[in-house]
Amino acid sequence: MKRGKISSLKGELHIPGDKSISHRSVMFGAMAEGKTVIKNFLPGADCLSTIACFRKMGVEIEQNGSDVTVRGKGLDQLAEPAELLDVGNSGTTIRLMLGILAGRPFHSTVAGDESIAKRPMKRVTEPLRKMGAKIDGRAGGEYTPLSVRGGHLKAIDFQSPVASAQIKSAVLLAGLQAEGTTTVTEPHKSRDHTERMLSMFGVSLREDETSVSIEGGQQLKAAEVFVPGDISSAAFFLAAASLVPGSEVVLRNVGLNPTRTGIIDVLKEMGADLEIEEKDTGNTEPYGDLRIKTSSLKAAEISGDLIPRLIDEIPIIALLATQAEGTTVIKDAAELKVKETNRIDTVASELKKIGANIEPTEDGMKIHGKTPLTGGAKVSSHGDHRIGMMLGIAACICEQPIDILQPEAVSVSYPSFFEHIEKLAEKA
């Protein structure tokens, strides 16, 4: 796909629904008793994989674009799947679903695409095994396909080695089905959509700074869910409007969960012209409108407990940093190596091809700005949606057009991404 420079971006967008919240609303609706209605669901490939898996376990789910109805019959009515549960490209689907399957008294097999086959699963399967689930797979349960025989679980006090919402959620969802109280403690607080949404579905949890406890045996009750726009998708347009001259863009109803707004903190630190209007809706997940204009940016240091709040935004932050005065340092982000691709390597190699001055490090990268991006190269998403979108925005400011291979990867989380660039470019 050939993409070239854009003179300016103007107008407003409704960003598609948050991927994390869309996954959980379907899963928790499937576990609950009654009819769960979901508005502004993200119909991207990952979330559709979640729907397909729960349909294979006998759950009735109607999906019409971004409106979804889940008719749950309670956890005990989930049926043994006759076929493989295929999660596609979705790490969230597989890791959270393992927590649910761990407590179900049946056998299931879970696998996904080539990228999922390379992603580490032992960090999830080990605590679930300690609770009593029988899980096996390649390399002793490290890689898919995984075979799960669930059943009676005992509560656990689990110290997670990394701040990961997926690990935390898998253990909490198993804990919901276990005998006793399960506690998960993390080195830093990771995103808390699971805790907020379990509360919405009637489950009580105890939380402090870095740990969460859940009592086994609680029933979920159906809920009505409004899914705010995904801040990880919004980040690409926040960056685009900051970088493309003469731009002003408004993004409507974007999720502002504080465990996810690291990108906003970084943009402010870099000097972006950004206004936030939070809406007081009483929604479990806060959201609001973001207005951003072209800005002169300066370098930032990104590390420590900021990393879990913006791990998925690092590719687009790296692009921003190429246009910021000074050297931006990103560290403590080794988790990037086990994303859809090794994002430390793919971000550095693809941005270098178009003229960026960037050095990969063991746990992050150093980006020297401000550097004009020459473009005029063949680049690739490597099948990673966030790399594809980073390159789509990079093209807008490159001197020469670039040719993006595997652009369809963006459909994992943002099927209308390229159309939305065109929409804002037309208004300009």
Curated annotation (Swiss-Prot):
Catalytic reaction(s) noted: 3-phosphoshikimate + phosphoenolpyruvate = 5-O-(1-carboxyvinyl)-3-phosphoshikimate + phosphate
Protein name: 3-phosphoshikimate 1-carboxyvinyltransferase
Binding site for phosphoenolpyruvate: 19, 91, 119, 166, 343, 386
Keywords assigned: Amino-acid biosynthesis, Aromatic amino acid biosynthesis, Cytoplasm, Transferase
Primary subcellular site in the record, as a coarse category: cytoplasm
Complex and partners: Monomer.
Cell location: Cytoplasm
Signal sequence residues: none
The protein's Enzyme Commission number: 2.5.1.19
Domain of life: Bacteria
Family, similarity comment: Belongs to the EPSP synthase family.
